[in-house]
Amino acid sequence: MNLAAIAENYSMHNGESGAIVPYVPPPYNFASAPTFSQRTSQMESVSLGILNQAMSSTTGASGALKDEKAAFGAMAEALRDPEPIRQIKKQVGIRTLKNLKMELATMRRKKSALKIMIFISGCVTLATSMVGGLSIVDDQILDDYKKNDWLMKTIHGLNLLCTTVLLAAGKISDKIQEEISRTKRDIAKRESYVSAASMSWNGDTEMLLQGTKYGES
């Protein structure tokens, strides 16, 4: 038997026409979506990057920079949380935002009322102090004071009362300002968490799914 017959016989048994060695296709590596562990690792990496950004920024001495750091922390927390917990916190945060903004508006109205009270008390205190000072340098005014004892008592009483109101209102206004700052920071944290929870993650980029009007039902 010659070589041509041997090759033809081998081809017939292997089902390959015109080929001595059978063709074996190379294996294909199909692209697959990232696994859950990979996505979790990527989310943790982004969370760590956000925290590093917050820590490496400026010292945060002003209120706006402190709010920025709180927002960074809320974003990082949202990326660390599992999806079910993230969605629960998102829904609760949206409901809480409305109440926080109402409280913030109430505190601002109280502070405005205290400012008016401080202004009026300051004007009365200044006026009564000026009258008392003039009575020291002017003998005629001092004589009128002595003749009208009730007027002297009234002026001194108003001065003492308005000074007390001025000091008390100033302390209350400072406390309300601290509460306003804390409430604004809480609002910034919740808005940032809701924004981060509304983003989709594909391993490379973040994309906001929908615009959320915080605090509105």
From Swiss-Prot:
Among InterPro entries, the record links this protein to:
Orbi_NS3
This protein's superkingdom?
Answer: Viruses
Q: Which Pfam families match?
A: Orbi_NS3 (PF01616)
Q: What does this protein do?
A: May play a role in the release of virions from infected cells.
Q: Which protein family is it in?
A: Belongs to the orbivirus NS3 family.
Q: What is this protein called?
A: Non-structural protein NS3
What organism is the protein native to? African horse sickness virus 9 (AHSV-9)
> Lineage of this protein's species?
Viruses, Riboviria, Orthornavirae, Duplornaviricota, Resentoviricetes
Q: Gene encoding this polypeptide?
A: Segment-10
